[in-house]
Amino acid sequence: MKRLLLSSLLLGVSIAAYADNLRYFGQTPQSYQSQIDYGNNANTGHYVLSDDTRIYYEVYGKGEPIVVLHGGLVGSTAEMGQFIDELAKNRQVIAISTRGHGKSEIGQRVPSYEQKARDVQAVLNQQKIAKTDLLGFSDGAYTAMMFAKNYPSQTQKVVAIGAGEWVKGARHLGDGNFEPFAQLDPAYWAEQATIRPEPKRTADWFAQSIAYYNELDYSQAIFKQIASPVLLVVGEEDQNAPLDTVFSAYKALPNADLAVVADAPHPAFATHFRAVWAAVEAFLAKP
């Protein structure tokens, strides 16, 4: 059964400052930051070999498992900190740094969503987790839904934030030049260079990722094959996943809910966390 949730809560994010923790892309003094150094926490960090790459992940809390997946290119586990803080109160959270991000290696394979889904499965197998919920933002949302499509027996529910139908040719993300992106937040990239295992390959990884995205076809045919319940969350002002693309995905998914957050951008949870969390919490609690 499908259900449409319209959320217009306009609550801001909590403010906390923990200067020693990793910053995330675009972070400001007003941004939420956890007390925990997500994405760089040696106390909970693990590695797993997935095909050609060592994938880094962290485990928090106890209870039913849920995988948390950050955004792509400029994304990091730290940006998902408020979700992890909330979920870890009564869930086991597996926060994965996807290949090429944070402390995970880049490898030699194209960083496709099929490959990233395989990486998620490798983590779950190492942790001996038979079935799980997944929550992802943007690139992480596409990875989560690809996992649900390719590994339905291991998927319970999926929360996909900022992700809609992506028809080949509909978006062109540029020529893959890393420098303009590096200048958007130099402090973030300087810090990332200190934890990434292959910092000298960042520009090449970035170009390879952009080339993949420019040819990506994540169409209704994929969404129609996802049997697990999916909650799509989108900001009303999302320019990366415009409303019409999310509506298209919603119509194609066999079992979907939709939450539209009024006046929110692509990272809707960064500006309207309580509104997003209310939808996520209710969805995950449903039998």
Locate predicted features:
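Short beta-strand/loop motif that positions the catalytic acidic residue
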Residues: 226, 232-234
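Catalytic histidine neighborhood in serine/cysteine hydrolases
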Residues: 251-267
